Amino acid sequence: MGGTPQKLYFGYGSNLWLDQMSHRCPSSPHLGLGRLKGHKWFINSRGYANIARSPSPSPSRSEAEEVWGLVYQLTPEDEATLDINEGVPYAYEKREITVEFWEKGTGVVGGDGDKDKKRGEEREMLVYIDFERDKGGFKPREEYIVRMNRGIDDALKEGVPKRYVDEVLRGYIPAEEQSMEVQKLAEKQAGGFRDESGVVPTRVTAEAVGSGVDLLKVGGGGGGGGVKGIRGVLDGRE
């Protein structure tokens, strides 16, 4: 059958938050779970999640030498919007990488860490990586903590091992609520991201919106119906 080609996208940061992805990329459904071996997860100098190859993987696999994420089927239109949200090419670059994939609902991966009950299928996926700021050890931005915690909640429900969350993600992301002011900023960022690190030129977003990729419509960042679901989650109403 013909049709527009679609990619598999591996999200490992705040795009673990299903509601955020549904507003940023409304035509790109969540398909399942992914594991990227031989890589490490960290917060870089921008204050956001990044991954890099593990320098010397140990013979016995550890949580710190693999990255877990959620997998989405990405349309070309949503990919263009995601590029803007990810600050391509200034903040992140795009790569096609082999990721182990479990289809949603298979129930082969759980919080007990029994990840090898059934091997996943190896698939090529789109991954966003910051190759310039490739070191960890930095604090996450406060609003990013909010979005990551929502993503962690969804990731655990979808089968990301709790041990990975505890040993890797929780090393950077505290399980705590932020102030209402910070939560409101997180709400805006979830609807349509605006870089606060100074890495992405301000004009890039303006040019992209002018070319027809309207973040306010796609993400609901203007305070309309598109962001309602996100606001409800942050306020605890939904």
Language model feature labels by segment:
Residues 2-238:
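Glycine-aromatic micro-motifs
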